[in-house]
Structure formats: C-alpha cells, structure tokens
Amino acid sequence: IPADYITYPVSVGDPVFERLFRAEGPFDIVAHFAAHKHVRSEKDRYSIEAMLENNVLSTARLLDLLLESPPEHFFCVSTDKAANPVNVMGASKKLMEEAVLAYAAELPATTARFANVAFSNGSLPAGFLERLAKHQPLSAPSDVLRYFVSPEESGQLCLLACITGEPGDIFFPRLEQPQMLTFSSIADALLERLGYEPVRCASEDEARELAASLGPEDARWPVYYFESDTSGEKG
C-alpha cells in the first residue's frame, strides 16, 4: 500500500468530514460511493427516511461543499433501478442523479448505473456462500431474471467514468438479453463448480431435512427454488 494512501473512519455526512475536506483539499477526484442499494431497505418508514437521507440529501450537501474547492472530477455511483424506477430505492438514486446533473455546469461530474454486482456484500449470491459455509440448503427464486457484472467489471466501469467521462455522462454496462440469469441457475452453477450435485426439494423443510442427513463427504446439496415477484436484490 502506498505511503500516501490514507483512510479515515469518517462518514460523508459527519461535520468532521467538512473539516477534513477543507484542511486536506483540494482533491483531483472525489468518488462518492456511500449509498443504500437494497430494495429491501424500504421495509418501514424509518428505513426509507434513512435511504433518502443517504442517497439524496447527503449527496446534495456534499455537492455544495465541493463548490468551495471543486475537484477536477466528481463521480457518484448509481443503479440500473434508477431507469424508470418502480421502487423507492430506484427513485432515490434517480433523484441523486438529477442532483449531480444539476451541478454539472459547476462541477465536472459523472455517474455510473450498475447492474447487480455478483457476490457483492448483501446480495443473494453472497448469501449462497454463507449458507454453504454453514452447511445449509440453498434457496432462491426461479423466475427472477437479473443482469450481473463482476466486482472487477464494476470497478472498471467506475474508473472509466472517473477518467474518461464528460460532465453529465451516465455510464452503464452494455448487456444483452441472453446474459440475464436466474438466481436458481447461479446456485446450480456455483454448486457444480464446487463439485456438488444440486438436489431439488419441494419445500424448504424438505431441503433442511436432507441437509441434516448428509455427511461431510456427500457430493449432493439440497436446493429449494420457488416463484417470487421480487428478490430485494442490490443494484
């Protein structure tokens, strides 16, 4: 790690962040990644208020602060759910994009819309790995299709937006229809990659019973797939 790589345990919304910015700036690039990215963060009014505070209001305050000493480039991460949003999370990120674009005349700002980042923290595929570590059956919707990018691809997208983007640009991965995957197909592929044979069960209880009966050397792994209207996935 380079000697000039410094981290601080500070939230972008903390008053100490403003003091840090004024004391240590100006900066070449400011990349803003703080966000609520889960649809399931809409579970109650307090969660929604926290989401709007983090995704919209704190971003607007950060933009006001940056006007004091504008960086050469400002980047803010968004989500594919900001396109024609159908939930509060997507709408909050759309509002964030509008706020960023409103400052484009004074700040060279870009953003990037992600698809789901495969196996990122809090995602359903990451939950598969946690269940495997606990010797638990995998459970997933079989009728939900999603686009995915790898963590490496998501990082490359951010770098491209930071380095090559023009003010007001919104970057997004160009993915085709055949690249959409179901969570059940991801679970099957993961198990097969690890040397296991997925065994489909008719219920979650049946899957748990089978998991409890399998020995450590058994190559079978119980799975339960179901139809669902939403996955609560992160974008």
Language-model regions, residue ranges each:
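Rossmann-fold cofactor-recognition segment
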Residues: 2-15
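Hydrophobic/aromatic anchor residues within beta-strands of the central parallel beta-sheet
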Residues: 7, 51, 74, 109-112
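NAD(P)H-binding glycine-rich loop region in Rossmannoid oxidoreductase-like domains
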Residues: 12-53
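SDR active-site strand-loop-helix element
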Residues: 30-36, 74-79, 112-114
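NAD(P)-cofactor binding segment of oxidoreductase domains
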Residues: 44-73
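Active-site Tyr-X1-5-Lys
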Residues: 61-71, 85-112, 120-134
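A conserved pocket-lining segment of Rossmann-fold NAD(P)-dependent short-chain dehydrogenase/reductase
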Residues: 127-149, 153-156, 161-183, 225
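Mid/C-terminal beta-alpha module of Rossmann-like enzyme folds, strongest
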Residues: 164-235
